Amino acid sequence: YLTEISGKGHIEIVKCLVNLGANITTNNNYAIIQASEKGHLEVVKYLVGQNANIRSENNLAVRLASGNGHLEVVEYLVNLGADIRSENNYAIQSASQNGHLEVIEYLVA
């Protein structure tokens, strides 16, 4: 359930589940990937604080955040070392295909 709840941005429920023993790295860290894809920065930050791997699945979290135009999440993940060049510059390609100019400008700056 943690992955689904993270993707919905319910931070208090995420915290509760983690406190009850939910594994944040289940399914290759998909909780942080889902939160990133949906733009839930507070959840992303919390999961990072719980040692979620931002680079799992070839940096899928930053790639999905880019493709969905979630600039604040992209900035946060990049500042932590996410690789925007993984998968042949997928983050930039995806942001471009989906018309997210602010994300593109940030990624190429």
UniProtKB/Swiss-Prot annotation:
It comes from Acanthamoeba polyphaga mimivirus. The keyword Signal does not apply. Keywords: ANK repeat, Repeat. ANK repeats lie at residues 1-26, 27-56, 57-86, 88-109. The keyword Repeat applies. InterPro entries: Ankyrin_rpt, Ankyrin_rpt-contain_sf. Gene3D superfamilies: Ankyrin repeat-containing domain (1.25.40.20). Signal peptide: none annotated. This is Putative ankyrin repeat protein L482.
